[in-house]
Amino acid sequence: MEHRRLGRLGRENSVLTFGGAALSETTEGNSDRAIQQALDAGVDHFDTAADYGDSELQYGRWMGEIRDRIFLSTKTGLREKDAAKRQIHASLERLRVDNVDLLQLHAVGDLEDLDRASGPDGSLEAAIEAKEEGLVGAIGITGHGNGAPATHLEALRRYPFDTVLTPWNYILSTDEHYRADYEALVEEVKSQDAGLLVIKTISRRNWPEGDPLDGQRYATWYEPFDRQEHVDAAVSWVLSHDEVTGLAMAGDVNLVPMMLEAERRRMTREEAERVLSRAPGYSSPFVSVPF
């Protein structure tokens, strides 16, 4: 498993981050199997969130065994300081740890959300206090939607977040406005030496409506690629960008083996683009969705 430097934090993390959303609504057996598969493949960054159902509890059963050899991150999606502070403490209890390596402000995808989180008595203040108390090692920000890169650029101008997690994939890069926002964010990330993490790598499109034969086969809110060739190409394309520290694995345990295999089966960016440009139904996930 390739490792890359997580910005100024200096930590060399696996390029695949295990996404705890995959554990939100599955059995302990499926959770354990997926976590072990990731560990065996060399994944050492495990991410979750307070909003991911039982994910923190599923992680918590493993922490006694693996905490000292992984980078652990979680998120708070609350915007008010006191509520976020309570949620941070609850997350630590659910994870069965004294601290996490990274706490992220969750789903900050537009300026209204950013204003609430970064304003007086916002969740950013709770995160800063938690860091001062040794409960979290670093502070990051995440978000979905077309406005995420521009919002995260503004966030970095307001506060030196250690990491940014934002959407990036081949189809998003074909939107000139989105690409321009992403490239501006990358410049600021590099200037501040922050870590850049990516989501929506294997998103194919929104789930089709009204077709029972093409229903929601996975727990992801978008329809993912699930042919190995397409997964290989999507992962390869994202990891061909040197600014990307790593990518979050998709939110379904059944996709874990394919993404682990894709990290091993790299193709060039040009090869990946040839495959993805022919992928049927490939479109932005941010169409008619609440982000």
Go through each PLM region and give its residues.
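A short, structured active-site edge motif that brings together acidic residues
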Residues: R69-E80, L102-H106, T166-Y170
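N-terminal binding-site loop/beta-alpha segment at the start of enzyme catalytic domains
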Residues: M1-I70, A126
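Short, acidic/polar
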Residues: T26-A38, K81-R96, N146-L156, E229-W237
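Beta/alpha (TIM)-barrel catalytic core signal, keyed to glycine-rich beta->alpha loops juxtaposed to Asp/Glu
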Residues: V108-F291
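Active-site groove signature of glycoside hydrolases
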Residues: L92-D115
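Conserved, mostly hydrophobic/aromatic
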Residues: L6, F18, A38, F46, ...
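Acidic (Asp/Glu)-rich catalytic clusters
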Residues: G7-G10, D40, G60-D68, H89-D98, ...
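Alpha-helical scaffolding within the catalytic cores
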Residues: M1-R4, E56-Q58, Q87-A90, A148-H152, ...
